[in-house]
A protein has these predicted regions:
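Conserved catalytic motifs of ABC-family nucleotide-binding domains
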Residues: 152
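A short, surface-exposed alpha-helical micro-motif characterized by mixed small hydrophobic
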Residues: 197-199
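Conserved ABC ATPase "signature" region
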Residues: 98, 102, 109-127
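Helical segment within the ABC ATPase nucleotide-binding domain
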Residues: 170-183
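Catalytic Walker B motif of ABC-type/P-loop ATPase nucleotide-binding domains
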Residues: 156-160
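ABC ATPase "signature
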Residues: 215-216
Length: 251
């Protein structure tokens, strides 16, 4: 059984079809990358996959549970780090993780223990009492990841988890995600950085205009090229015309 099965998803905003019949199969136990240029439909797809946004058509199943007809069972299995994360930022980092853990039904003692372990692992222990509204963008990203992990989900869906994160924290996040997959979990993550996806993911899909243009194992998609070269080939690289922005060179 796949960890995530997305079938014929459609989402339209006015006369723009952001997601256009997109289907995706994420194998259980995989580290799966979702890549595409800005406006390709990645965030909209992930929002529908997690139940944050209702599709106009199509279905989403998490380990056999339909996200829309069986939302309680499906969402209990998912940990989510959405794009443009909005949290209760008048709580401290420690309070926020505990709060999310209690919402997820964890015992208070377990919630406290896991909060401390996550704060330590993500390098936030020294700032645990600081209000989240005073966190940097990278710290906010890390506290969001802690909240996604606290209930030990079976599927993590992460939108740009490495954005605004420093190299040391990024390396720790990679270690956490690798350990999560090694223990039987599944990760679906989006990123604009091909090098991150190439180093971390075993499978991926390239999305453009709300459609999957290529999908499979990393080697299948790359076809012997680097992922960056293959990505540019699939989506169509743009080249700056010689006369463009000529005024920049006039001084």
């Amino acid at each position: 059984m796949p960890a995530l099965r997305v079938t014929d998803l459609v989402k339209t905003y006015g006369d723009k079809r952001a997601v256009d019949g997109l289907s995706l199969l994420v194998p259980a136990g995989s580290m799966y990358g979702l890549v595409g240029p800005n406006g390709a439909g990645k965030t909209t797809t992930l929002s529908m996959a997690t139940g944050l946004l209702r599709p106009d058509a199509g279905t989403v199943e998490v380990l056999g549970h339909d996200v829309w007809s069986d939302p309680v069972a499906a969402k209990a299995l998912i940990g989510v780090l959405p794009d443009g994360l909005h949290v209760f930022d008048r709580l401290s980092g420690r309070e926020l993780i505990r709060y999310v853990a209690l919402l997820r039904g964890l015992d208070r003692r377990v919630a406290d223990t896991r909060a401390e372990e996550l704060l330590s692992a993500l390098g936030l222990a020294d700032d645990a009492e600081l209000l989240v509204c005073d966190y940097s963008a990278g710290m906010t990203k890390k506290i969001g990841l802690a909240c996604a992990l606290v209930h030990a989900p079976r599927l993590l869906i992460l939108d740009e988890p490495f954005e605004a994160v420093d190299p040391v924290s990024g390396d720790m996040i990679r270690q956490i995600l690798n350990a999560f997959v090694a223990s039987g979990g599944t990760v679906l993550l989006s990123s604009h950085v091909m090098e991150i996806v190439e180093a971390l993911c075993d499978s991926l899909a390239i999305v453009l205009h709300g459609r999957v243009l290529a999908a499979g194992t990393l080697d299948d998609v790359r076809q012997g090229d680097s992922l960056t070269d293959r990505f540019l080939d699939v989506v169509g690289a743009r080249h700056l015309e010689a006369e463009s922005l000529a005024w920049l060179h006039s001084s």
